[in-house]
Amino acid sequence: MNKDEFLDYHKNCCDYLVDLTRKKNKDYSGNNDNPFFNYESTERLNVTSTEKGFLVRMLDKYNRINSFIEQGVFEVEDEKIEDTLLDLANYSIMMSAYIKHKKNK
């Protein structure tokens, strides 16, 4: 893969994540206009802060990646390592947006 191919791949991943986020946000938040509604549920339930809720989800993904590295396969065959890595990238972007949103309140 050369640099241009990498940049095309990166752009395609980002475009895919925007579309996936739009769909999942609707699934998890319904018609609620708050993109962080689902993540803030950890605070509404007095479990932990929203930021730590993001971290828990990210740790789940890290653990899944670590398991894949150690075992070389996933038991759930319809989810690939690329899906898990993209999920992790998406959680990072969402947490970054949440922190920016909270700072600007």
Where are these regions (language model features)?
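Intrinsically disordered, low-complexity regulatory regions
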Residues: 1-105
